[in-house]
């Protein structure tokens, strides 16, 4: 039996705990907050899945059939809690404890082959056979500094909560990723003058086709983007 450290109790962390336990390993998971679910706890109010519940759920634990096709953030948080309870994952999680330092143990072999030393915010140092990092990639916000050009309000998607943050503003959304598109739609639905800029061209299409999620229609991939636009 090997002993592993998992950093973070968001969706990836929870799935990793179960997978490692199923493989017969001993697990310690450290979560710096007091809740599971990661960024789903504090992201913008309009956050929802962009893939359908049928293809997004954890293996062996489908989402309830009566839920919306593209569940809202609140549904997802409930789902994570149900998943953790169903497989008794919480007892492997230490909350309010951050991992502050990770380094490989000394060895003449490949890095990490002798194990890893992990120090947590409670000052305890532990050793593990491996470390799985599941702390997410949305915590650090990158806002470019362009002095002397724009003096208006700047809001990063990681800080945006709802339309109250930009009420009455003329809105420019930079980027066409998932968050960018969500926020552009949020602003437009509030009747704000909304524009979106992107590095390269994109094809924006409905999430459903005749009531079916596009991700479930394999035959759609046989068509070009232009043909898909016409069909949609």
Residue ranges and their predicted role:
Residues 1-4:
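Extreme N-terminal starter segment of soluble prokaryotic enzymes
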Residues 6-90, 198-207:
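Beta1-alpha1 glycine-rich phosphate/pyrophosphate-binding loop at the start
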Residues 69-139:
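Feature captures the FAD/FMN-dependent oxidoreductase FAD-binding
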Residues 6-12, 16-36, 124-126, 131-232:
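Rossmann-like dinucleotide-binding core of oxidoreductases
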Residues 43-45, 108-109, 209-213:
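Short low-complexity, flexible loop/linker segments enriched in glycine and/or proline
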């Amino acid at each position: 039996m090997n002993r592993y450290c998992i950093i973070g109790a968001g969706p990836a962390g929870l799935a990793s705990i179960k997978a490692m336990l199923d493989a017969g390993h001993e697990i310690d998971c450290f979560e710096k907050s007091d809740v599971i679910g990661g960024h789903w706890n504090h992201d913008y109010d309009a956050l929802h899945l962009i893939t359908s519940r049928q293809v997004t759920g954890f293996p062996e634990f489908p989402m309830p059939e009566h839920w919306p096709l593209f569940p809202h953030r609140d549904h997802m948080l409930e789902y994570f809690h149900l998943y953790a309870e169903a497989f008794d994952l919480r007892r492997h999680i230490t909350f309010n404890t951050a991992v502050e330092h990770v380094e490989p143990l000394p060895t003449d072999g490949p890095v990490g082959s002798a194990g890893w030393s992990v120090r947590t915010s409670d000052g305890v140092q532990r050793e593990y056979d491996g470390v799985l990092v599941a702390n997410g990639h949305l915590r650090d916000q990158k806002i470019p500094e362009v002095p002397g050009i724009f003096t208006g309000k700047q809001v990063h998607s990681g800080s945006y909560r709802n339309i109250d943050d930009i009420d009455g503003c003329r809105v420019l959304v930079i980027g066409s990723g998932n968050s960018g598109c969500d926020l552009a739609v949020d602003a437009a639905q509030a009747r704000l003058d909304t524009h979106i800029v992107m590095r390269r061209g994109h094809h924006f299409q409905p999430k459903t086709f005749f009531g079916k999620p596009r991700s479930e229609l394999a035959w759609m991939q046989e068509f070009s983007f232009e043909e898909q636009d016409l069909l949609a």
